[in-house]
A protein has these predicted regions:
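Helix-coil boundary and N-terminal low-complexity module in membrane systems
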Residues: 1-139, 151, 170, 175-205, ...
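Membrane-helix boundary elements
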Residues: 130-166
Length: 266
C-alpha cells in the first residue's frame, strides 16, 4: 500500500497489477510526487559541496575568462565521493517505488546508505578519476586535431567513451543496491546492459540529462532542490528496472524455481 496525498485514496496492488510500464510510471509518480520532493531535499544536502564548488568555479571562469582548470576536477573527486552513499540510499528508495514496492523516505534511505557505502564511495571515486582523465584527454586531443584526421577521430572518440561511461552509471547504482556482486562485475554488467539497448538507453539518458540541465540553469535555487535530482532519477530507474527484469531477474527467477523444484523432489 502507498502513502501519498491524504486527499487521495491509497494506491493498492490491484490498481496497478498487470499495468504497462508507462501506466505504472505515471500512476506511481502521481502518488509519490510529494515524497520525491522530500527525498530530493534530503539528497541535495549531500550534493551541497559539489554545488558550491561548481558555483565557485563558474564565478572564477567569468572573472578570468579561463577554461575549467585541472584543480577543479581534482577537488571535485572528494565532493563526488561524499554523495556516493546518499546516491545508493536514494536509488534504493526510488527503485522500490518504481517497481511498485513500498519504501520509507528516511529509514530505507538510511539503511541502504549504511549497507552500500563502501561500493558507493569507490564508484564515485572511479567517476571522479574518469572525469579527470576524460577532461585531460579531450584537452590534449583538442589541441592537436589540426595535425591530422586521426587525432580528430580520437577527440570525438573520447566524447563517445565519456557518454557511454555516464550511461553505465544508470545501471551501476541500481545493481549495487539490488545484487550482491563485486564492483568489477557490476561495471561489466553495466557496460553490457548499456550496449544491449544502446539507442533507447541514450534516449532515456538524454531526457534525464536535459531535465537536470534545466534545473542546473537555476543552480542553488528552488527547481534543483525540489525536483532536480529525484525526478530524473525516477525516470532512469524506472527504465533500468525494466531492463534488469528483462535480462537478469527473469533468469534469477527461473534458477530459483528450478532449485525449489529439486528440493521438493528430494
Amino acid at each position: 500500500m502507498y502513502y501519498g496525498d491524504p486527499r487521495k485514496p491509497d494506491l493498492k496492488k490491484e490498481d496497478v497489477k498487470g499495468s504497462s510500464r508507462f501506466k505504472l510510471f505515471f500512476t506511481v509518480l502521481s502518488v509519490r510526487f510529494w515524497q520525491l520532493i522530500q527525498l530530493n531535499l534530503l539528497y541535495a544536502v549531500f550534493w551541497l559541496p559539489s554545488y558550491i564548488w561548481l558555483y565557485i568555479q563558474g564565478l572564477l571562469m567569468q572573472q578570468t575568462n579561463q577554461p575549467v582548470t585541472l584543480e577543479f576536477f581534482i577537488l571535485m573527486i572528494p565532493c563526488l565521493m561524499l554523495a556516493g552513499p546518499a546516491t545508493a540510499g536514494v536509488t534504493y528508495v526510488i527503485r522500490n517505488w518504481a517497481r511498485d514496492d513500498h519504501a520509507w523516505v528516511w529509514s530505507d534511505f538510511k539503511d541502504a546508505f549504511k549497507e552500500n557505502w563502501k561500493q558507493s564511495i569507490l564508484m564515485m571515486l572511479i567517476n571522479g578519476i574518469a572525469l579527470l582523465l576524460f577532461s585531460v584527454n579531450v584537452r590534449f586531443y583538442g589541441s592537436i586535431v589540426s595535425e591530422g584526421f586521426f587525432y580528430l577521430l580520437l577527440y570525438y572518440f573520447m566524447f563517445i567513451l565519456a557518454i557511454i561511461f555516464v550511461m553505465m552509471n544508470m545501471f551501476v547504482f541500481p545493481m549495487i543496491v539490488t545484487y550482491r556482486l563485486k564492483l568489477r562485475q557490476i561495471l561489466r554488467n553495466a557496460f553490457i546492459l548499456t550496449m544491449v539497448k544502446l539507442p533507447l538507453t541514450f534516449v532515456v539518458f538524454a531526457l534525464a540529462g536535459f531535465l537536470m540541465y534545466l534545473s542546473l540553469v537555476y543552480l542553488l535555487s528552488i527547481p534543483f532542490f525540489l525536483v532536480g535530482l529525484t525526478f530524473p532519477a525516477f525516470i532512469v530507474i524506472s527504465y533500468v528496472n525494466w531492463i534488469l527484469d528483462k535480462y537478469i531477474n527473469i533468469h534469477l527467477d527461473e534458477e530459483k524455481e528450478e532449485t525449489e523444484g529439486e528440493e521438493t523432489e528430494s
